Amino acid sequence: MGGVLRISRLTQFAVALLVGAGLPAWAVDVSPPPILQWFESSYRTVEERAADLFMAGYGFVWLPPPYRADTGDQSVGYDVYDRFDLGRPDRPTLYGTETGLRTLAKTLHRADIDLHVDFVMNHNGYSSLGTPGFVAAGGYPGLAITLPNDIDGDFHSAFAMGDQYERLAGLIDIAQEKNHRFIRSPVDPADARNIRAGQVPAFGRLANVPDPGNRRFYPDRGHGTIFVFDPRTGEANIPVHAFNLNDPTKGDPVVENATGYLMRNAQWLIQVIGIDGLRIDAAKHVQGFVLDFIDRAVYRQNPRRLLDGSQKDVFTYSEVYDANPAVLLPHVRKDINHADPGRIGGNRDTLDFKLYFALKENLESTATLGTWQTIKNAALDLADDGLHNGSAGVTFIQSHDVFKPFGLENVAQAYTLMMPGNTVVYFNGREFGNRDFPKPGRGDALSVRDGSLLTRLIEARNTHGRGNYVERWDGTDGLFAFERESSAIVLLSNRGDAGFDSRTLTQVGFAPGTLLLELTGNAADPRVNPDRGGRRDIPEVVRVFDEGGVSKVNVRFQRPGTITRDGRFDFHGKGVLVYGLATPQAPRGVELSNVAKLLPGQGEPDNDAENGRRRQTDISVITAGSFEVRLRTRPVRLLDSDALRDVWADGDQALLKLDAGRDVNGNGKVDFATPGSTAYGFERFRQKSSPLIGAGGLGAARGEGEFRQVVDASKLEEGIHFITVRAWRHRTDGGPAVFSDFKRVIYIDRLPPLSRVASIRPAGGGVDLDVRSTDGTAESVHAFVDLPAGTSEQAILAHVGQGEGRLNWVDRDLFRAHLGNLPSGPHVLTIVTFEPTGTGNIQKETVTAP
């Protein structure tokens, strides 16, 4: 590679910033943090487990389609009914509500995690012209089910044939090439341009009825307007208006065709809901021009800027169920030029089904002949430029649609995680039962309490996933090795027998004498590598040596099976080892002062369903006005052995990041704001910064290995926050940065939780009382009407302790109670609110019952 492509954080080739050494940056192949495809969990659960997502090291979360589904509220969501109905308090989707999704996006953004959703633009649901009452009910919101001059309206005929016209799995296919123009989210009932409104409800639904509230689904003409040129169509001076986030009622309805409706929905998801990326469902079944228009819809539409003020590009990636590069590559478009912002470009990739099919076929069982020769040449990444550099393809080994390679899934997962480029890990939370669809996922995707092979692989990817790909063993014997040059060596085996295989790897990218530490934990796992009377077959540390001027290293490949100490064959499937440069050690991790209490995690769950629901990470509660962050590193002796002293790993710098990057040391800025650097978003320690290896290098005076920073908690929002301290290995060889990350999750609880009455209205012979958590911290709310004057707080809390007056949770920030026989007129309402820390607050408010 000759330069750095600044595409987006997800797809860019990042620069290794050698913070301590002060050397120039080098452009190298990069493995961005992985995408977690998380299905079958509610937004509430995903938000609750944001701490685990952060600790595991995911950079992106991909959720299912958020729309109202056609077949009911238990649907996964691919059968779309209404694209602008993401769930409401009185009728959530399977996953929750629009407010819940918005809040989840904000929480993930605070953790420096991007949120992706499935974007369905090929089809709607199963209802059609033949569905009784559907036409009279208005059909689908925003799309004409039939028209006087076109019986199929905005859709293709049920008899149409071909990938881009037929009904996929019976789902009605949108005809994006048609140009029927309407106001598709109607506001004014007198506007003749409106799409036809439904007249008679069917299945409790009535579509396309004009509603002033629909203004919020439109951009505000003239607000935040940009003018762009589209090189795909040749159109110039195209006005693109922004949604008015401060006053959504200023949205301006406009006429549009079906493609325009889909474009508006994409823009709305990005700007209003807080989505950062779109996984485009069934992209093989839409015509190519549609993808270009989606590129236009999201181009420069992310209002969340990077720390240096530059544009953060929306990332899209297509599902194209095909192994042919000639079919896949046209879906890859990476031509955004930030130096020419008026020219529309795309930041689009595609899921790598070509590699998936090779992994599934060759790692379904052990000892498949030619496995590695097939796999290493299968990636779509090779098809665009002949290099394994992450320039094309989003890799995966399983998804909601397709099964994993059952025999050697760990080997397959290690391969994709340690390669350059973007990759997906799939997790099924099982919150809604053990349904056949979506398919099962990795049960250990969020096993952060004690760690798992998967989470350790993710850590290795994040800390050592920089450096160009170089093949080190060719795989003809069932063994395959590649190096992330000067960073880590990956050893993979698909052999069917037990034991290990010794090999010497030559021309490795490490200096003679360099120690390499096994990073996956397999070498230390007593099941994989049992103690055999004081020795183990697989070493935890190997040393690079020189032979004839060539750097070499002796390694042992771990086979997927082991002979136990009592002579049994044990197939564990963990034919994976990763040896990487050692990095700084801090046995106590991030130390915090002024911790008032701990919200403990719930330990390692026994199954996928529990893993989907239960937070494992401990959260430290801060109630003081400030707290100190401290890291204490120690001289690195691998395996606590003086013979394995690695002074380079002592480290020459540590930096602090709070949330996604904010000023915590009081100098008025984020110290490192260059996108793509390993220091992006981090701050210098101001109270004390004393790395073991000082600015003078190895031969100069040494520091104490201590770093301290006082953080002003009064400047932090109430609720959860995320701390990362990153400590870098000392390098003078120009190699890519490697580091250790030390993390803590905190909860700021300086102020009492606040709530207020949102509404009180007639319902079911009484009134419904809605109370909103105005600061978003409430876990439970109780309400009492007209308590006697002078009722003490102790007496109120006694009522609460008996479970009295508890409101039902109906939305992320909304609680409801039905009050029967409440006389009309004024009443004094006593509201008691608790947040997850146990902190409570008693408030009084006068309301008027209807």
Label each PLM-derived region with a short phrase.
Residues 29-48, 55-273, 289, 293-307, ...:
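Substrate-binding/active-site clefts of carbohydrate-active enzymes
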Residues 30-32, 48-54, 73-81, 105-117, ...:
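Active-site-proximal helices and loops of the catalytic beta/alpha 8
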Residues 712, 739-753, 845-850:
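Flexible, low-complexity linkers/stalks enriched in Thr/Pro that connect modular domains
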Residues 713-720, 819-826:
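Surface-exposed, short loops/turns at beta-strand junctions within beta-sandwich domains
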Residues 728-736, 834-839:
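Short, solvent-exposed loop/turn segments at the edges of extracellular beta-sandwich modules
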